[in-house]
Amino acid sequence: MNNFNQNATATVLISGGGSNLQAFIDLISSKILKLNILAVISDNKNAHGLIRAKKAKIKTICIESKKYPNKKNFDQKLSESIDMFDPNFIFLAGFMRILRKDFVKKYEGKIINIHPSLLPKYPGLNTHQRAIESNEKWHGCSVHFVTEEVDQGPLIMQSKIPILNNDSSDKLAIRVLKREHIIYPKTAELLISGRIKYKNSQAWLDGQLLQKPIML
């Protein structure tokens, strides 16, 4: 088990609305989630998530993509910003940049992402529309450790919902997002308690290799 003398620490990386960030903030405020978010970092100065962070009195940092057209320079600046806080975890919450392999390697086992599909199905973008067009019966979201291959890291937790006959991609996205707000904090709780660990490039639960993601 992890023995954090104080709350575990994290930085959260966002690009947009930050609703998953807000789910974290609400549970932290309610004393349910024992996590101290040290900073919220965005690559978009207009991200609404920055406003959410400021309202919660969390430090915000903006590293604008257009100022760093070179991916290596952007990742270096991002790494410097994260290292100022030395967090236990780095949560990607709608962070739309693909991180370079050497960046991911540096923080291996500490970076967590949430993705709007039942991975390994539908990595990448436009997951809801792709699921509908493929006549899937089920769709959902996944939390996973971030590795060098995009959306391919060890799965930790998933939640699935049925695709309804009248579902549009927008309707489906709203319903999936509600599940994201549940499983991302739940995953954080398991990480903080030490029940979930990253070892040998795999996810482990209570000392046992996690053969398949926890379904919630």
Which positions does each model-derived feature cover?
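Short, surface-exposed acidic-centric catalytic microdomains
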Residues: 35-76
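Alpha-helical structural signal in soluble globular domains
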Residues: 26-31, 52, 56, 81, ...
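Short, well-structured alpha-helical segments in soluble
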Residues: 76-85
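N-terminal glycine-rich "phosphate-gripper" loop used for MgATP/nucleotide binding
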Residues: 42-43, 67, 71, 85-101
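A general structural signal for well-ordered alpha-helical segments in protein cores
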Residues: 18-21, 49-50, 75, 128, ...
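Donor/substrate-binding cores of folate-linked one-carbon enzymes
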Residues: 27, 89, 93-206
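N-terminal Rossmann-like dinucleotide-binding module
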Residues: 1-48, 52
